[in-house]
Amino acid sequence: MRTVSINVSNLCIPCYNRCRYCLLSWDGKTIGVDYPRSEAYARKFYNWLQENRPELNFAFYFGYSMEHPHLLESIDFLREIGSPGGEFLQFDGMKFRKDEEIRELLLNLKARGIKLIDLTFYGTEAYHDQFAARPGDFDYLLRILRIANEVNLDVNAGLALNHENAGQAGELLEQLQRYRLSRVFAFVPHGEGRGENLEPVRFRQSDYDGLPASVKGIFNRQKFRPEGQWVRERRFSTW
């Protein structure tokens, strides 16, 4: 095994969603240290790697959301150390804002060097809001998407597929295609963290078979395969 990168993550920022498959197992309580302390630690780690292991990639992340009280200043630090968050932000779970507040935030982010934001959709409106455990979240993401288009900030949109929402994927994609997207893709949520909650509704081969061609076209079949196919091809680690 070869080490190629080192990541430091601090779960110190609350998220306004409670999604059923949260990788970080967000349960309403932050577990990280205070942000200034974590930034100082990340800086020391980065400086050490630059002097001793410059061939290793390094990234610093904070979560559970990007609702950082000093987000713009933190972006400066992320860009300074070459962390992806200096140019790209996952925009799920942000607090509700009025349109003019969204516009101001996005313009400030652009001015700070952010080039791309990412939004995740869990189905059409009613199902999405239930899945994210926040009424109004679907409409809020569409407002963010619309205003991002207006200020010329690139947006990626991910469609999280499971057994319950597979039948909504075509309608959802049609709705999203009314906007300008840098990339739109469908994926199967992971099983880590609170993703264990999705096991009863895990996406199945029959769900894939029923998808419209438009959705199949944005689904990475090489990455997301039935378990039986992975076993037959022996594309898994030996423990």
Predicted feature locations:
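N-terminal pre-core extensions flanking Radical SAM catalytic domains
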Residues: 1-31, 232-238
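Radical SAM enzyme [4Fe-4S]-AdoMet core and its adjacent flexible, acidic
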Residues: 25, 31-33, 39, 122, ...
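Acidic (Asp/Glu)-rich catalytic clusters
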Residues: 48-53, 75-82, 104-114, 146-150, ...
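Core AdoMet radical
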Residues: 6, 26-39, 52-68, 81-100, ...
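Polar helix-capping/helix-linker motif
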Residues: 98-99, 108, 221
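Generic structural signal for well-ordered alpha-helices
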Residues: 42-46, 72-76, 102-107, 142-145, ...
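SEC14/CRAL-TRIO lipid-binding/transfer domains and related phosphoinositide-recognition modules
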Residues: 10-14, 37-44, 69
